[in-house]
């Protein structure tokens, strides 16, 4: 793999890609996204922030396919045909680190740690590490994070760049395989709808810590499948959590 650095001064960004054989960016090394292209604000792009968007009619359709390490510090990944950022079949763990920026308005998940396109035959020995230190995942048609093959950590580093997973239509974080995990600390999960719940623990394990906020979602805030439990580890005074089991709802 190779290292890629995208900054506002070094690239024209990636926008409106059609009929490409793969995707917007296929990363097998290290991809540091500090920026892209600063577009003039318009009705189509009401922002002057860096953009990777409108990756359509490609083989896979996401803005970024990651098989290495993707570090996102700023910018927007939006409007892509199949997921904003997606891990694929790999023979080692891959890593997605969000320090800032926005993943929004994509068809499918904001981040898909699913080993697509063949999750049923992919080895369960390798997972995508998704570390949320800052930034926003919002308004995607699927989950904010589909963590079937994911190990998610939410640990907001600064109130100046908060972690927010909000207004996604397929829930916020979905855990569906025995090896999937989430350790959710300081950050906010709100305004999500659809799925079994904003944070849905169907399989795997879930730990809540710090000033985690899971509230204000449509339907369940925190869903636990029958027999599943959640670990509470040093919750802060600012923590806010609502829980739903298969038979009982707790506001």
Regions found by a protein language model. Name each.
Residues 1-21, 36-61, 73-85, 94-95, ...:
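Beta-strand-rich solenoid/repeat architectures in extracellular/passenger domains
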Residues 222:
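A motif-centric signal for short, conserved binding hotspots located
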